[in-house]
Amino acid sequence: QNADEGQDLIAAHDDPLVHYFNVPKKSVWDDDAIAAEAASHWERVRPGYARDMSAVAYFFARKLARTIDCPIGIIDCYWGGTSVTCWMDKEALEATAEGQRYITRYREQGGDKPFDQWRQEEDAFWVEMNAWNAHVAQLKKDNPGISWPEINETVGPCPWHPPVGPGSPYRPGGLIETMTKRVVPATLTGILYYQGEDDTAK
């Protein structure tokens, strides 16, 4: 839906050769995650659907299906802004110096704190984050031409990042357990990998 022509495509596209499955974005395996998994299913690309499909995966699948004239099924398993370490199990991380460095940094930042403590910090973070977003939205509504420096001067810088902890989607070795392994062993012909942007500065 965020692609340049996304809204027009969502309203009009109808491709019987392309299906997609969205793995529920869950960083903790709890009752909510179990219910989300039970409700998830394959969808065919048709008008009004695929709003939540990865744009990269959508355009790739559409072109591939037309090129080889064969049905294409895309499993969307991603979480924007995450490190590659979120999608690697701890054994793989511990096997390299780079992986060990991520684990050490995570622990130094308080990643091993009790779950309840992390949950309280996470809830408090989102109260602050949502309030900041609401202030920004109001500023943009009142002054459509306002610049980001002016916004930051008025409401302060964005309070991102969320706290680290045992339920954080950004923790090393987390999403591979709560997302990737939930769709294994699916039979895959290929993989599109474009996670890991968070690692570019590290």
Model-derived features: positions:
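Cell-envelope and extracellular/periplasmic
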Residues: Q1-K202
